[in-house]
């Protein structure tokens, strides 16, 4: 059974079409009108081995906030839908990723209880036209709609591009681990019997 989802979300601010295949090969087709986010989603798919297609249009003439946040929302929704009842998944995942001088870690629990711990202090700067404070908005939207507990920690690093890239790669690798099916797991990985 394919663990996939196709989501379309239309608001007055954004129009987003997204398809996700959890058991993919890391192939991506990304067009969000936000070049830096395209880059991050491309490497997210690659390092998580998810097949991901995103087409998004938003009110970027105002700024990128709505588009970035809403893509996080739709990606989280797609993961939740693709995982279904979560039977057989490992549930937990973690990754520590270096990117030159940067070291970032992500630990996640696909518990159904959304919570973001974001220990990534970034200067209020732009990478190209991208406000780096939107990284937090992306992950907040993701966890809220995926039902994931996500702890994102920057241990050290200076280059803002490297920091954000390490965070996205670590998130992808942790989610790949958490979504893996394990034949030893009967039902769900919870003493409650439900996630």
UniProtKB/Swiss-Prot annotation:
Pathway: Amino-acid biosynthesis; L-histidine biosynthesis; L-histidine from 5-phospho-alpha-D-ribose 1-diphosphate: step 6/9
GO cellular component: cytoplasm
SUPFAM superfamilies in the cross-refs: Ribosomal protein S5 domain 2-like
Domain of life: Bacteria
Record flagged with keyword Cell membrane: no
Subcellular location: Cytoplasm
Xref: InterPro entries: IGPD_sf, ImidazoleglycerolP_deHydtase, ImidazoleglycerP_deHydtase_CS, Ribosomal_Su5_D2-typ_SF
GO terms under biological process: L-histidine biosynthetic process
Recorded catalytic activity of this chain's protein: D-erythro-1-(imidazol-4-yl)glycerol 3-phosphate = 3-(imidazol-4-yl)-2-oxopropyl phosphate + H2O
Keywords of the record: Amino-acid biosynthesis, Cytoplasm, Histidine biosynthesis, Lyase
The keyword Disulfide bond appears for this protein: no
Pfam families per UniProt: IGPD
Record-listed E.C. numbers: 4.2.1.19
GO molecular function, a single term: imidazoleglycerol-phosphate dehydratase activity
Family indicated by similarity: Belongs to the imidazoleglycerol-phosphate dehydratase family.
NCBIfam families cross-referenced by the UniProt entry: PRK00951.2-1 (NF002111), PRK00951.2-4 (NF002114), PRK00951.2-5 (NF002115)
Protein name: Imidazoleglycerol-phosphate dehydratase
Source species taxonomy: Bacteria, Pseudomonadati, Thermodesulfobacteriota, Desulfuromonadia, Geobacterales
